[in-house]
A protein has these predicted regions:
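Gram-negative (and chloroplast) outer-membrane scaffold detector with strong preference
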Residues: 25-28, 59-133, 145, 194-202
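Transmembrane beta-barrel strands of outer-membrane/channel proteins
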Residues: 31-37, 72-76, 117-123, 154, ...
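A charged, solvent-exposed segment within the mature domains of Sec-exported extracytoplasmic proteins
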Residues: 116, 126-172
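Transmembrane beta-strand segments of Gram-negative outer membrane beta-barrel proteins
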Residues: 25-39, 191
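Cleavable N-terminal export/targeting peptides
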Residues: 1-27
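Predominantly the C-terminal beta-signal and adjacent terminal strand-loop region
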Residues: 79-84, 93-95, 159-202
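Outer-membrane beta-barrel translocator domains and adjoining extracellular loop/strand segments
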Residues: 42-48, 81-89, 127-136, 176-183
Length: 202
């Protein structure tokens, strides 16, 4: 449902932007910044679950042809609460950074509405992990993660330089958890990431 709603919004905005169609071409840069929401899947682990989080997202795209770009995703750290499975007591919190490098294909570089798809590689690092409640005083560690990422999105030009951006991406994040040095197994945080941003072309 979220993807359908996003696509409907993009279609409506594309009609509104049709009078300001601006091309992008080889050698152009796009810089975007805006609201980014990270939404882990519900069944992360048999014992614990990871809540959603939001932060400032940044991304940088370079057009090495008129259609193909390399994008680097960055962000201010996301902070997640970790609860007992089923939405129970908060037992920990952690921060993470999910830098992602993707190759994107932009379908209509000469139009104001520029949809694209992309695929790439994600590296996620966890830090500032704290414990509470039933786990207070214990040492919880979450290992770093490598995984694949895929995305869909669109840029909507508002003039020669300024643009709006909407995107949804899926990131494969899986961390190994340890409590006081003992393994708790893998925590699958495979997540949807939604972004609404403003950007500039140069």
């Amino acid at each position: 449902m979220k993807i359908k709603a996003l696509l409907s919004t993009l279609a409506l905005l594309s009609m509104a932007a049709s009078s300001t169609a601006m091309a992008v071409e080889k050698g152009d840069w796009l810089i975007r910044a805006g609201y980014t929401s990270v939404n882990p899947k519900g069944n992360n682990h048999p014992v614990v679950s990871v809540d959603s989080a939001a932060s400032l997202g940044l991304n940088f795209s370079y057009f090495f042809t008129n259609n193909l770009t390399v994008e680097v995703l960055a962000a201010y750290p996301f902070e997640h609460d970790i609860r007992l499975a089923g939405g129970g007591e908060k037992v920990a919190s952690t921060k993470h950074l999910p830098p992602t490098v993707s190759v994107q294909y932009h379908f209509m570089p000469n139009n104001a509405f520029k949809p694209y798809v992309g695929a790439g590689v994600n590296y996620t690092t966890f830090f500032s992990t704290k414990t509470y409640g039933a786990l207070e005083g214990t040492d919880l560690k979450l290992g770093d993660s490598w995984g694949l990422a895929g995305e869909i999105g669109a840029d909507i030009m508002l003039g020669e330089k300024w643009l709006l951006n909407f995107s949804a991406r899926y990131i494969d994040i899986e961390t190994k958890a340890k409590l006081n040095g003992d393994s708790l197994g893998d925590v699958k945080i495979d997540t949807w990431v939604y972004t609404v941003a403003a950007g500039i072309k140069f």
